[in-house]
């Protein structure tokens, strides 16, 4: 270091640098205006401290005097401390996290990962194979009847609007149109496409709420849940309704930062989702809350008005729909979402089933909600959507993770586990973003604990594989039974079949197998020759004595008490004979179907 004029050498000062800083502040000096500055010497090395140059090596102009002159100005007058700021390249710790930093390459990697997730989900659904279930058969043949009624004015055999879990002219007609083109496989393909769209929208929504990594984690977890796999393989309204609900959520998140009211586009989509399947009504408040919470980091408190506007407009639309369509739809919606099944002792089985269907995802969602509330980022300087205040983060976690528990509460209120498998998919869709946060926190920054994420996802995959296979094997292959029944069809004949929906669906188009010719063992309203209407066991017994049915089929599984009474009556009546016994075998179902025919 060069010596100052009239004073001792200036000691070397090391740069002030923080490990996480983007700049380095270097000590500097101001030269005497009368002295021409010399080129700066190379800075000393950290391992080799600066050495003072000897006086002989210095130019005469800068060689220190033996005694400072009193006439000379002091060092403080000619030399003042100052700093220079040098911007350094971003380091590993000071710059953005490499995984979360936007780049074209990572965009394509994320798209490829999403395609793989959707491919796995499709394979998991397509591997399930069985004949139509009772619910699928009901939706599809009712859709054919509704389409014929709309297009040709054909009479309907019943008032489907009074008990269907959705508006009968929506999904049933769509499913029937696909069935007309490619049969049951095409109708199921509609559901699969809807569920793949749902997973894709979940990724897009979560990516905007958090970031790319969290979106992929959420999609990977949701795609292997039992509800998503089953809904994608059943020709029912659940998948289409959930896809519409996902679209509504994506709209409110995508338009969160927009000043103009584009979020209102979510209202008709959400209402259509609820009309397709009344179960979606339970999740409309979540859509409204999500609209406000997603916009809060951008618009602050005025964003909460969005939630109120969405809720108010949706209520008005449904009120107008009820006034136009009639109270039958209200009755059906109440039955689907709020009517309690008689009986007790169902709480523990429902809790156990719910734990199997979604316990892992809900646990991850709770973990994600807590960790997100405590700390917005997984790693320092992680690229993430505006997290907002801690209150906002807590509210978002409670709304998303808590919606999964709403499904459980609704099933406990209904006192039944019927349709729990597909209903769980609705709640898990909303919990999946927070579950993605939880999985990302378990994995850690820079995939530090990737093995934990692999173990968790593998556990979810194994649960999805085992439970969906078990569910899809809970009803038997009906091919043999339908073939046996088709041998005894006759013009104007009546058929008593335990599950008549399946027979009606597979025999559609047969002139002697119209829906009005079938009766199930669930209910009968038989009018005697004297004009008296009998229901229940008395009605079935009176119909058998009168020879009302040509074919009677039962398997003692759904209505065992009634089937036992039917068997006793048929065995004592010489007009009926046992035409066959068809075994019904499935993975978790064993029964024998008895076919009685009146000669």
Which sequence ranges carry the predicted segments?
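Signature aromatic-anchored transmembrane alpha helix within multi-pass, membrane-resident enzymes
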Residues: 114, 312-315, 383-393, 437-466
